[in-house]
């Protein structure tokens, strides 16, 4: 058996010679057909289904075991004509054909590769392009993720992109933020510790030359100003002059540069409006922190310590006068810093609302809008009160009270008007409460009572208003049958040198109820049988009237007794009507108002059903109308005694039931 690779080795050795002979010797006419068939056979023999169209180079030519290598190479076995021709071909021709096949094979391979690969490369791109584009997509995705993480920390997209380009990652930026926060916390702790050391050692104010100390000074002034504003709103009479003095001193402080202190690492500012005690340095730092606020002077009264004078231009800020070293400080948080106030140490103590030694009335400021609203509502209420519309007048007086600032003296007049209206409609308990509120607004000093109340029209002093409030207070106690408290109120008026007839009569009424006098038995008068002429009767009457003077009190007592006797005669009849009206429901104001038409026969009273009295508001309106019809001052004089007694009983019964109804329904 011959070597199957003999022809291949021979073709490789004779490659150069075959190429030369090809160039010099022309090919025969049938060589292209042979060559083409050979190429086709090789292509059919070597091509496998697994070959990919995307391969860049053709696979090497490997002989198939089915090919008969004993025959001339590259000649199809199924063609008898070509095999016979190949068998008759000389060796030189075989070599030449072999060389032509190799040349054509190489060219065909390149051509086949180019024609097959080109469409795929145009559609999919080359392998190098795929690798390059994949890397770019991966880099862009990582960049977008990192920028998104940076933006989650509050950065804008431009800042996050700039940080990413500068190699500042999310973790690194987070570390930077943590380090800055730690530095700020450490700085705040150091400032607090240094401030405590300065207060304990009694150091003076310090101002640094750097920008941080200037910022601290500005912040200090802002905080102190805020404190003064808060205290001014709480103590307006005392803060007017102090705020002006503080502004002057504030301007002076800004003109000086305070010296530095070496033992303060942060050189922070000492508060310029606080007096600090010279305390010995404490050994325990925790104790310093706990007693930090105790070293500062607050609103409470304490003894001022001795403060060392400073040689700096601002020494006057922290100087406390010698005359007040042993005196209690009042409201030291509002200390004055001007030099003029240092000589007058007690000017602030005389700025209270009612000072005994002052001749002027320190008033609470009131705006023009508040004052005009007060006068307008007061005028409406007075007009309604004169017309007998006490309910609406009470509402107008309450509006006038609500327009005034708290603790303003005009509130006394407004409350006095409200009390007068409440007496007319039977709200005695409420009138007593308002009288207590009004009495609390009076000056504590008797000397101030002679002063006129500011913005009062017409002008009235405290002495003019006080007895009116007290008399109405006593009358309210009488209507509530608290005769003991009413008597005490009348006696207090008498102690203040108020001896009005109304006061004295009220006192006697209360005394008669508390200690009723014994009833004297009248002696029976014997009738004389002797007859006298009219002339003698007239003479006797004139003589008796001239000889036996009868006092006015005795005649009034006689009339009272006659009235009491008449009432006593009608008592049973009136009691029966009132009892049938109550029907055992004295506390049920809805029942009383719904059945009131059977008693109020002398006035135009509209029937009210129980369905109309479901809402508490409707109950209140109906009650006000009923009280206005039955009030003793609203009853006409021409009314019969029986109806007067019925009206009095209705008024008192409704007043008691209304007080209980207000408590049950939480009505003011």
From Swiss-Prot:
Its keywords, alphabetically, are: Cytoplasm, Endoplasmic reticulum, Membrane, Phosphoprotein, Repeat, TPR repeat
Phosphoserine occurs at which residues?
A: 52, 64, 264, 308, 312
Q: According to the UniProt entry, which residue ranges have a biased composition of type Polar residues?
A: 17-36, 340-359, 539-555
Span list, region CB3? 303-362
InterPro entries linked to this entry: J_dom_sf (IPR036869), SWA2_UBA (IPR015228), TPR-like_helical_dom_sf (IPR011990), TPR_rpt (IPR019734), UBA-like_sf (IPR009060)
PROSITE patterns per the record?
TPR_REGION
The primary site where this protein sits is cytoplasm
Gene Ontology terms, cellular component aspect?
cytosol; endoplasmic reticulum membrane; intracellular membrane-bounded organelle; vesicle
UBA domain residues: 140-180
The segments labelled CB2 in the record are: 238-302
Function of the molecule: Cofactor for the uncoating of clathrin-coated vesicles (CCVs) by Hsp70-type chaperones (SSA1/2/3 and SSB1/2). Coat disassembly is important for fusion of vesicles with target membranes and for recycling components of clathrin coats to the cytoplasm for further rounds of vesicle formation. Binds to assembled clathrin and recruits the ATP-activated chaperone to CCVs. Stimulates the ATPase activity of the clathrin-associated Hsp70-type chaperone SSA1, which then disrupts clathrin-clathrin interactions, leading to release of the clathrin coat.
The entry describes its oligomerization and partners as:
Interacts with the clathrin light and heavy chains CLC1 and CHC1, respectively. Binds to clathrin with its N-terminal domain containing 3 clathrin-binding (CB) motifs. Association with clathrin is transient. Binds to polyubiquitin and ubiquitinated proteins.
Further information: Present with 768 molecules/cell in log phase SD medium.
Question: What name goes with this protein?
Answer: Auxilin-like clathrin uncoating factor SWA2
Question: What is this protein's gene name?
Answer: SWA2
């Amino acid at each position: 058996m011959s070597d199957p690779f003999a022809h291949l080795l021979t073709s490789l050795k004779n490659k150069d010679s075959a190429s030369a002979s090809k160039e010099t010797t022309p090919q025969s006419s049938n060589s292209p057909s042979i060559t083409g068939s050979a190429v086709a056979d090789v292509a059919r023999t070597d091509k496998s289904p697994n070959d990919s169209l995307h391969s860049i180079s053709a696979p090497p030519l490997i002989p198939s075991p089915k090919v008969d290598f004993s025959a001339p190479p590259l000649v199809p076995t199924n063609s008898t004509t070509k095999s016979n021709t190949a068998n008759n071909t000389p060796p030189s021709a075989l070599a030449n054909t072999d060389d032509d096949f190799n040349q054509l094979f190489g060219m065909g391979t390149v051509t086949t590769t180019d024609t097959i690969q080109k469409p795929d490369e145009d559609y999919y791109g080359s392998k190098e392009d795929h690798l390059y584009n994949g890397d770019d997509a991966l880099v862009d995705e990582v960049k977008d993720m990192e920028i998104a993480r940076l933006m989650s920390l509050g950065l804008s997209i431009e800042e996050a992109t700039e940080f990413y380009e500068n190699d500042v990652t999310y973790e690194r930026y987070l570390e930077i933020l943590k380090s800055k926060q730690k530095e700020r916390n450490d700085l705040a702790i150091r400032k607090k510790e240094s401030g405590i050391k300065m207060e304990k050692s009694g150091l003076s104010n310090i101002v640094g030359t750097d920008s941080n100390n200037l910022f601290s000074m500005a912040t200090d002034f802002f905080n102190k100003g805020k404190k003064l504003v808060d205290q001014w709103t709480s103590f307006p009479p005392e803060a007017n002059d102090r705020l002006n003095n503080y502004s002057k001193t504030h301007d002076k402080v800004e003109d000086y540069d305070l010296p530095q202190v070496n033992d303060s690492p942060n050189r922070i500012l000492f508060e310029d409006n606080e007096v600090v005690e010279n305390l010995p340095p404490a050994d325990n730092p925790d104790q310093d922190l706990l007693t930090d606020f105790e070293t500062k002077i607050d609103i409470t009264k304490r003894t001022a310590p001795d403060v060392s004078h400073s040689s700096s231009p601002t020494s006057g800020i922290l100087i406390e006068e010698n005359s007040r070293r042993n005196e209690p400080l009042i409201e030291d948080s509002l200390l004055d810093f001007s030099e003029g106030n240092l000589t007058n140490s007690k000017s602030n103590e005389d700025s209270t609302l009612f000072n005994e030694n002052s001749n002027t009335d320190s008033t609470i400021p009131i705006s023009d809008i508040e004052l005009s609203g007060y006068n307008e509502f007061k005028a409406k209420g007075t007009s309604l009160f004169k017309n007998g519309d006490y309910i609406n007048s009470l509402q107008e007086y309450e509006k006038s009270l609500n327009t005034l600032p708290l603790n303003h003296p005009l509130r006394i007049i407004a409350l006095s008007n409200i009390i007068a209206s409440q007496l007319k409609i039977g709200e005695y308990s409420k009138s007593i409460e308002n009288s207590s509120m009004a009495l609390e607004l009076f000056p504590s000093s008797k000397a101030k009572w002679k002063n006129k109340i500011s913005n009062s029209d017409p002008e009235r002093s405290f002495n003019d208003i006080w007895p009116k409030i007290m008399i109405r207070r006593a009358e309210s106690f009488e209507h509530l049958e608290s005769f003991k408290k009413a008597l005490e109120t009348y006696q207090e008026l008498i102690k203040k040198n108020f001896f009005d007839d109304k006061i004295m009569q009220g006192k006697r009424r209360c005394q008669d109820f508390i200690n009723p006098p014994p009833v004297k038995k009248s002696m029976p008068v014997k009738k004389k049988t002797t007859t006298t002429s009219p002339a003698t009767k007239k003479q006797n009457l004139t003589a008796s009237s001239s000889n036996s003077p009868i006092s006015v009190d005795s005649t009034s007592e006689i009339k009272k007794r006659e009235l009491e006797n008449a009432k006593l005669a009608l008592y049973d009849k009136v009691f029966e009507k009132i009892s049938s009206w109550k029907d055992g429901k004295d506390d049920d104001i809805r029942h009383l108002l719904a059945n009131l038409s059977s008693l109020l026969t002398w006035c135009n009273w509209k029937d009210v059903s129980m369905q109309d009295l479901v809402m508490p508001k409707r109950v209140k309106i109906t009650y006000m109308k009923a009280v206005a019809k039955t009030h003793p001052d609203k009853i006409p004089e021409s009314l019969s005694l029986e109806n007067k007694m019925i009206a009095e009983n209705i008024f008192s019964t409704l007043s008691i039931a209304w007080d209980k109804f207000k408590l049950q329904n939480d009505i003011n």
